[in-house]
Amino acid sequence: MELQSRPEALAVELARHQNGDLKKQLHERQPRIAALSDKQALGTITAVPVTGPQVSSLQRLAGQGAAVLPQVRPKTLIPDSLPVAPGRDRPPKQPPTFQKATVVSVKNPSPALPTANNTVSHVPAPGSQPQALAEPAALASPLSSAGVAYAIISTSPSNAAAMAPSTAVSVVSDSIKVQPLLISADNKPPPRLLSSPHPATHHCPLHPSSLPLTPPSPSLSPSPLHGIFQVIIIQPQVQTQPESTAESRPPTEEPSQGAQATKKKKEDRPPTQENPEKIAFMVALGLVTTEHLEEIQSKRQERKRRSTANPAYSGLLETERKRLASNYLNNPLFLTARANEDPCWKNEITHDEHCAACKRGANLQPCGTCPGAYHLSCLEPPLKTAPKGVWVCPRCQQKALKKDEGVPWTGMLAIVHSYVTHKTVKEEEKQKLLQRGSELQNEHQQLEERDRRLASAVQKCLELKTSLLARQRGTQSSLDRLRALLRLIQGEQLLQVTMTTTSPAPLLAGPWTKPSVAATHPTVQHPQGHN
């Protein structure tokens, strides 16, 4: 049943869409649109294709959401001369497949109204007729602060070629809806107009009698749920008038007047009254107060002024506390002026002809601050080559260092000097500890080497002891064997003696040589056995 009722409803909607009364009302509205002023008519036409959702009458009958068209929210007031289109209070009767919108934007002579930059928001289209009609009626004021644009939207692509030559804005079809759009004065870019996928822009001059419409792009094919409508924005040209120029000058002069006012405020601002307790506290800590800072700056300027007379001797005009040992060594001219109280640029120094160390002459190196001269070999440490430029002897260097140590330090400089001294002492201590640590490390390495040598010597001694013990045991065994042999020989001699005493005749009858040899042998070997 729904499928059979849908064509009938579609036929009814088409019949309502082609209404003669609506055509008549639109033709009556055209002269009022053509009666716009030249300010609203002159301008350039900008055609920007914008994609927007399209809701057909079938979808509207099915109960789906109403169509939403991107439109500029009215941030300014709507003039009384703008008509309210009657087509806004009735829904469209034909499913739109292509939409065209012609927007005639009016620009105020004020330069603070850019019509190209607008804020775009979604305004419900034909669904909210009472609210849309109530807004223009409530916000009625003369056209003085914002531009006004007319949006002529066509929902019938077949009647898009119908145009009225006698009107200021072309009539697109019978079902054209004329909607006044307000261009806001803020400079926010329209996100939906600029983010369209096909930004085709055409510029052409506008005549008050006709407004040509740009044909739609063939590549912009409609979709079943989204249609493509084209917005033509006419930006009027600003006419230079004496009143507008006079009105536009004060905004440019305001920043300069504001800058002058801030300068006057800074100049007229009284000097800050410092707390006496704060000043006393700063003085007690040695900090620099405002008055002391101004005094230091004035003295510095005076020193700069005086030093420009002779830049070579600018170091002589520095204060005592700013002189360091390095400055003394690097600037010997100052040493002469301070040590001898006789500036070297007034009287030339007559140097000695003999060395101050060995009292001999020839090949002397003169000092730049005193009359003394030295041999290069007599210096400590001795120099191999003569130094270039002005040379300072060790005696003058010691004088300068002693004089620099006696300079009193006051205020903040005393704190800085004490900190520098403390840091120097700590650094020296650190260097001494590092040196002592390196010495101890070297000593430790030497002791380890000595320990290794002693360990090897002890090992050798133990090996020698074991070898000597082995030899001693061998010698003792050999001695035991010799003693046994001696006892055996002595026993044989006693046997021979006893035999001779018992039978002397037979023994003397024959020659006997062996006992004599055996008798002599024990006499020789006996002392060895006792040893």
Curated annotation (Swiss-Prot):
SMART domains: PHD. Residues 265-277 have a biased composition (Basic and acidic residues). It comes from the Eukaryota. The keyword Transmembrane helix does not apply. Residues 522-531 have a biased composition (Polar residues). The keyword Metal-binding applies. Keywords: Coiled coil, Metal-binding, Zinc, Zinc-finger. Gene3D superfamilies: Zinc/RING finger domain, C3HC4 (zinc finger). A zinc finger (PHD-type) spans 352-399. It holds the Pfam family PHD. One of its GO terms (molecular function) is zinc ion binding. Residues 423-465 form a coiled coil. This is PHD finger protein 21B. It comes from Homo sapiens (Human). The gene is PHF21B.
